[in-house]
């Protein structure tokens, strides 16, 4: 098998289909994987798949990260760093913006200019430290987007951002996991749209997650962090409501007003003030 040829060893419980070697311009087929498999194609066309690395990954890792041949030609010609390219396949997106950004710019433009410069540095450092990729420096206005192959890394990054002093800025952060599409190295499609709508529900200082992301990070949260079930809420312009969770930690604010939505579907078993705690058995006991 390919892994054996490259690394002189065979990872347990993984059977990689030999179709990987065909150089096709779509993600390779992976069969009989006990864990999800992350595939990274590195190097130039001369190396082809010699530097392809296949390895078992924890369950919160996206299904597949694959650089097709035509894109590798562009990478080689432009001298780009493959590790900093936006991941594709199943990823967790972090989308954040500055609460009341327009008002802050009007009231204290000089302070905001300094704060935004500090924010840019803080965001870039946090994303890099947690293995994420920022496709563009700015997404819309004072918002930004980052992509992570591990949902737990996205949650840790969001937590670090909220724990950092950014005054007078307060960030609203939304996390969602799903299939993504790239167009001119920018994410488009339903996954980023849903992430943006989740972020719009949040208040400054708050991190909200979709049910998909919440499932992936349960049991893999940073130390002392936990999730709170906020119930199911409609998302503006989207047909399907979302079950929303909040990422909490002793170092950040926990109590917020109701989410920024016109109405909530009364599907939670308990009232909002008695929401379900997830991943906090030790503190509760």
From Swiss-Prot:
InterPro entries: A/G_cyclase (IPR001054), Adenylyl/Guanylyl_Cyclase_3/4 (IPR050697), Nucleotide_cyclase (IPR029787). GO terms for biological process: cyclic nucleotide biosynthetic process; intracellular signal transduction. One of its GO terms (molecular function) is adenylate cyclase activity. SMART domains: CYCc (SM00044). PROSITE patterns: GUANYLATE_CYCLASE_2. Residues 92-199 form the Guanylate cyclase domain. It comes from the Bacteria. Pfam families: Guanylate_cyc. One of its GO terms (cellular component) is cytosol. Belongs to the adenylyl cyclase class-4/guanylyl cyclase family. This is Uncharacterized protein Rv0891c. It comes from Mycobacterium tuberculosis (strain ATCC 25618 / H37Rv).
């Amino acid at each position: 098998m390919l892994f054996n040829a490259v690394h002189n060893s065979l990872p347990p419980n993984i059977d990689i289909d030999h179709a990987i070697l065909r150089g096709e311009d779509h993600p390779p087929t992976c069969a009989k994987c006990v864990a999800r498999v992350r595939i990274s194609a590195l190097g130039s066309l001369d190396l082809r798949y010699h530097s392809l690395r296949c390895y078992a990954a924890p369950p919160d890792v996206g299904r597949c990260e694959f650089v097709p041949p035509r894109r590798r030609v562009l990478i080689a010609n432009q001298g780009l760093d493959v590790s900093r390219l936006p991941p594709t396949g199943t990823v967790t997106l972090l989308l954040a913006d500055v609460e009341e950004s327009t008002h802050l710019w009007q009231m204290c433009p000089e302070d905001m200019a300094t704060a935004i410069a500090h924010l840019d540095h803080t965001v870039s450092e946090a994303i890099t430290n947690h293995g994420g990729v920022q496709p563009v420096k700015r997404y819309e206005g004072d918002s930004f987007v980052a992509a992570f192959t591990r949902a737990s890394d996205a949650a840790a990054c969001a937590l670090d951002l909220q724990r950092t002093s950014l005054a007078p800025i307060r960030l609203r952060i939304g996390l969602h996991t799903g299939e993504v599409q790239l167009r001119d190295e920018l994410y488009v499609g339903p996954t980023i749209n849903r992430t943006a709508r989740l972020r719009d529900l949040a208040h400054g200082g708050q991190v909200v997650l979709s049910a998909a992301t919440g499932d992936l990070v349960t049991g893999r949260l940073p130390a002392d962090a936990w999730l709170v079930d906020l119930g199911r809420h409609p998302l503006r312009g989207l047909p399907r409501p979302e079950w929303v969770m909040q990422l909490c930690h002793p170092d950040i604010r926990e109590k917020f007003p109701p989410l920024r939505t016109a109405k909530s579907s009364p599907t939670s078993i308990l009232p909002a003030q008695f929401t379900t705690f997830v991943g906090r058995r030790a503190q509760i006991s």
